[in-house]
Amino acid sequence: MSEVKKPLALIILDGFGYSESDKYNAINAAKAPTWRKIWAENPKTTIATSGMAVGLPEGQMGNSEVGHMTLGAGRVVYQNFTRINKAIADGDFYTNPVYTKAVDDAQSQGKAVHVIGLLSDGGVHSHEDHMIAMMELAVKRGAEKVYMHAFLDGRDTPPRSAKAPLQKTEEKLKALGGGKIASIIGRFFALDRDNRWDRVQQAFDLMVDGKAAFTAQSATAGLEAAYERDENDEFVKATAIVDADGKPVTIEDGDAVIFMNFRPDRARQLTNAFVDKNFDGFARARVPALSDFVMTTEYSADIDTSCAYPPEDLVNSFGEVMAKNGKKQLRIAETEKYAHVTFFFSGGQESLYEGEDRILVPSPQVETYDEQPEMSAPEVTAKLVDAIENGGYDAIICNYANCDQVGHTGDFDASVKAVEAVDAALAEVFAALERVGGEALITADHGNVELMYDDEAQQLHTQHTTLPVPLVYVGKRDISLEQGGSLADIAPTMLALLDVPQPTEMNGRNLVKFSK
């Protein structure tokens, strides 16, 4: 048996925001005695998870990738979203050498430029302004065949909100005097991340072979037809936008494809379908010999293709500091959030640090998580309790995915059950910590289930919120937590509790005040 230690656990309740209002609030509607007790009796505060506090534009909701990177970094990391916004604002975007080479090489051979990505103002995986800017770059550099293949959101935005970005794009292209939206399809198909290749194939076949369930004369007409079929944005079936002759636009040999998503996880599978020489996800009728395939950010170090905005090094994150100080750490989550407690929490590093262990618990194989709101929380909890009692860890980072993943479905009753499942898990975790004399910080990476309906849009609120999230200390020490913090302050706070020096690169602040 390993040495029994008194670990510090960081428990991340994904999508568990803070709102005093009971209106549309699945947390306040849930039977959650464990949560209510610690919130009433323990040192607590709320912290910011959105906007400039996490390196995003002001007012922009946070997300799991940004949240976990900020949690682990202990500083504000200017996210790719902000980085690209800044490049567009100062003009550097339009001279980015990777983008311009892709456009110029295709144009010089009379070939087409295809801009693909999530056309949305959600700002989680992409932004419509980036896609429109890319179309503008191509048209202004003289490319005559410039096409957009738009993936529709409805997950990080209201379920039926795609009309505005489609109209905005059509109006901009009309003003530019070039470019066309060539196809639309829901992100459910194009941006799968769980190896459901049958979905991705529908997006690939649409763009490469023009194989479509439906055709339309314009993108907005195609969307309206989808709504008539009762398809929300996320689930819009493959629709080719055709001219009067009925012929779809297809990606051909010598064309350039530019993928404008800046968040990697949901861009990898479709990218691999285009560029992986050993691809075996599905049978491709045709694989175009592209002049270039550009990923806007590095979707994976293993993907061998052009990258417009390569990663910037992030040194002395929490995991690295722990390793340098000879400490033992564990990262644990189910599949949906495993990358977040590992890759993102480690500042974009795939490999393990010295003294780091990882536990991956498979997520349930269901169509949507409202079918199983408890997800794999019981299995995560069983392994977490064992790690607390027997693992000999100094620090444990754990994510419970339920509130975010179920909250995205918009199902209020299922979201209440998700909260209750997490509450039951917390009861077991706290009991284990008490048995070994351990302690915990409970927080979230962003909100979701505390606001499940959008009064203004008159639709379900399936996306993240900009509300603050709780931070609670559970343990025997007599401490208080300072107000006005953010996710960037969590790593410094953990290091203070562990009596590990905070490196200069971490400019977040320790929120713990120890009683004298």
UniProtKB/Swiss-Prot annotation:
Annotated residues that bind Mn(2+) 1 are located at D404, H408, H464
Query: Which residues participate in Mn(2+) 2 binding?
Result: D14, S64, D445, H446
Binding annotation for substrate: H125, R155, D156, R187, R193, R263, P264, D265, R266, K337
The record, for Pfam families, names: iPGM_N (PF06415), Metalloenzyme (PF01676)
Q: Name one GO cellular component term.
A: cytosol
Q: Which cofactor does it need?
A: Mn(2+)
Quaternary structure and interacting proteins, as annotated: Monomer.
Q: What is its EC number?
A: 5.4.2.12
Q: Which gene encodes it?
A: gpmI
- Described function: Catalyzes the interconversion of 2-phosphoglycerate and 3-phosphoglycerate.
- Family, as annotated: Belongs to the BPG-independent phosphoglycerate mutase family.
Its recorded reaction(s) are: (2R)-2-phosphoglycerate = (2R)-3-phosphoglycerate
HAMAP family on file: GpmI
User: Which one GO biological process term can you cite for this protein?
Assistant: glucose catabolic process
Gene3D superfamilies referenced in this protein's UniProt entry, alphabetically: Alkaline Phosphatase, subunit A, BPG-independent phosphoglycerate mutase, domain B
Active site residues of this protein: S64 (phosphoserine intermediate)
- One of the record's GO molecular function terms: manganese ion binding
The first-level EC class reads isomerase
Give the record's pathway: Carbohydrate degradation; glycolysis; pyruvate from D-glyceraldehyde 3-phosphate: step 3/5
Keywords, A to Z?
A: Glycolysis, Isomerase, Manganese, Metal-binding
Native organism is: Saccharophagus degradans (strain 2-40 / ATCC 43961 / DSM 17024)
**Cofactor remark:** Binds 2 manganese ions per subunit.
What is the protein named? 2,3-bisphosphoglycerate-independent phosphoglycerate mutase
